[in-house]
A protein has these predicted regions:
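Conserved ABC ATPase "signature" region
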Residues: 121-140
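Short coil-to-helix segment of the ABC ATPase nucleotide-binding domain corresponding to the Q-loop/switch region
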Residues: 102-111
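The feature captures the beta-strand-to-loop junction immediately N-terminal to the Walker
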Residues: 45-47
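Helix-to-loop junction immediately C-terminal to a conserved catalytic motif
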Residues: 60
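Conserved ABC ATPase signature
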Residues: 144-148, 152
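ABC ATPase NBD coupling module
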Residues: 76-96, 121-122, 141-142
Length: 166
């Protein structure tokens, strides 16, 4: 059930309208609408095979919808590649581990921060230090992702997702 009008894009940062995804004759996502306000965090709940991950993949640009559109700040981004959406702040924190196990914690974050052309190298370093402190992983800065506990890995994933200031 929708709690707000999907056509009211002015108050929303991200809107997905009428998303469909079909693989052959199998419909895996059927007419999904999502509206996310700036600074809002959302999750989708549902049974296995309901299309939750596929919906997030369409929003982030990992896969193209069969039908439907995605808007970010009133601009249609449906056909934008994933890297352009990421630069605009569209991100997804997957339920499966997504940090690079052979990279250090520091380099996992730097990988994203280096895409921030709006930040100087010094500002990138300050952002890195701040996020490591905020998530209590400064002491793990030089540790490889594959050596982290589940909770540490999750905190690094969240810190990395915030590198783009979504």
């Amino acid at each position: 059930k929708q709690s707000r009008k999907m056509s009211d894009q002015k108050n929303n940062s991200l809107i997905a309208k009428g998303l469909h995804k079909k693989y052959g004759s199998r419909m895996v996502v059927n007419n999904v609408d999502i509206s996310v306000n700036r600074n809002e965090v959302v999750g989708l709940l549902g049974p296995n095979g309901a299309g939750k991950t596929t919906t997030f993949y369409m929003i982030t640009g990992m896969i193209k919808p069969t039908k439907g559109d995605i808007f970010l700040d009133d601009k249609k981004i449906t056909l934008d590649p994933m890297y352009k959406r990421a630069r605009k702040g569209v991100g997804y924190l997957a339920q499966e581990p997504s940090i690079f196990s052979k990279l250090t914690v520091e380099n996992n974050l730097k990988l994203v921060l280096e895409m921030r052309k709006d930040l100087s190298i010094q500002e990138q370093e300050e952002k890195l230090d701040g996020l490591l402190d905020d998530f209590s992983v400064s002491s793990l800065r030089g540790s490889k992702g594959g050596n982290l506990s589940g909770g540490e890995r999750r905190r690094v994933e969240i810190a990395r997702s915030l590198c783009m200031d979504p």
